[in-house]
């Protein structure tokens, strides 16, 4: 997130501004907040009749991966402002057009397109240098791990590698049996991923200096890997194997639901609903988004 006294430009900030330019690298997941900083800035620009220019940048997950549940209206917040899938398959410029047209911002928007980019490119395919977008997104590949564990991390009951050298690449806790969890997750035969038993000690954050056991997530095929699907299976496996443990934290449930976009994931896991049934519930909305939004961008040659 961008931190400061306000989340949107004030009238004073925009005094004498002739054009407002957005040039920030995003990571392709709904709860990563730069896209809402962009939306708030677009709203402020619209109010002041200031042209808004987006210098488009690659979505590090590529331009075809759409996955996860849609955000429900009542869960709007700074970690999810609009009803889009958790992994949305659009660049920041494409999102700006979506926000402007579908959600009635109506600013004077211009998107400067990228050269040489195509939708099949993940970040490593672009040849660009990755500049960390925040301290816990040190590599372009981290953007693919973020939607695989980031929602779980909001619980604060499961460590996801933040505070260690592998942010978003781990699942750990003192009460996990590393071999057991790895065996369970690998038995689910999730596409493009392997889970390795892992033992580690975070340097800081919630589980600082605790000896944790769990799994390291190894993405074997970044084209086949489905991060949100994998995250739901991780939650379901933890609930199945360690049902006596406190997986959900009442003080963090509200934040978990905001990031997840509704109460559905949390309550379904709590009630023992299978991972596949949870995933099946969002398929119709996801496919509708792909047909209406993503295919429109593909047809326009973006």
Which positions does each model-derived feature cover?
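Short acidic catalytic loops
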Residues: 19-27, 53-56
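Glycine-rich, charge-decorated loop segments at or immediately adjacent to ligand/cofactor-binding or catalytic sites
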Residues: 53-75
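Glycine/threonine-rich flexible loop motifs
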Residues: 26-38
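Glycine-rich, aromatic-lined ligand/substrate-binding cores of catalytic
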Residues: 117-198
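Conserved anion/nucleotide-ligand pocket segment
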Residues: 75-149
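Glycine-rich oxoanion-binding loops at beta->alpha junctions
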Residues: 1-16, 29
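Conserved functional hotspot residues or short segments at active or partner-binding sites
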Residues: 172-281
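A short helix->loop->beta-strand "cap" motif at the edges of active sites that frequently abuts
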Residues: 47-51
